[in-house]
């Protein structure tokens, strides 16, 4: 249903359902197409994901492991790359039911959230993953030769990338809490001691490796994100 967004337009329940059906269809189609493209270029994606572990031998420990892992990576990659388009379809569906004031609040939040999510993935790929792999490879390298399972390696990488992307949503959560007047920037600042402890715990939970280097870097990143959220709320006078 192609139409211009009108905040004063009232739709019947059947029109809402038809609109929802079309948005879901478009979002699903985009996801399927992008996932298929990712699977077609799986060698290129695998090469990119293997870069932090140059020099490591990867083994296929079970029949079909590479195939099943390739499908998993293609699904994750498809979801990642199609997520902005899916969110756009969701936005088009909910905007007509919002007031102008609500739309001016939600749209920037969604846009910044996408940017932060991808920033978290880039941060993990450039900083966290190399730091974690370097520690794990060097630890005991004189005793054992690092030969890794292809599937387990990609599970490790994908979990770290996506968990970091989610962790980068902290400023968004803070801004929402501030705008809704649940917590003010002053109250968030007053709890900084608990946040230091919480950042350490969160870093330990979301990082798949147990090495201290990765957890320290992640803790610092979480604290920096939390501080940026407070600064943003200060600017907004919340």
UniProtKB/Swiss-Prot annotation:
Alphabetical keyword list: Chloroplast, Membrane, Plastid, Transmembrane, Transmembrane helix
Family matches, as PANTHER family: SEC-INDEPENDENT PROTEIN TRANSLOCASE PROTEIN TATC, SEC-INDEPENDENT PROTEIN TRANSLOCASE PROTEIN TATC, CHLOROPLASTIC-RELATED
Keyword flag Plastid: yes
One BP annotation, GO: protein transport by the Tat complex
GO (cellular component) term, any one: TAT protein transport complex
Membrane-spanning parts: 24-44, 78-98, 109-129, 156-176, 188-208, 216-236
Family: Belongs to the TatC family.
A Gene Ontology molecular function term of the record: proton motive force dependent protein transmembrane transporter activity
Topology of the protein relative to the lipid bilayer: Multi-pass membrane protein
Name of encoding gene: ycf43
Family annotation (PROSITE patterns): TATC
Name of the protein described by the UniProt record: Uncharacterized tatC-like protein ycf43
Localization per Swiss-Prot or TrEMBL: Plastid, Chloroplast membrane
Domain of life: Eukaryota
Protein source organism: Gracilaria tenuistipitata var. liui
Keyword RNA-binding in annotation: no
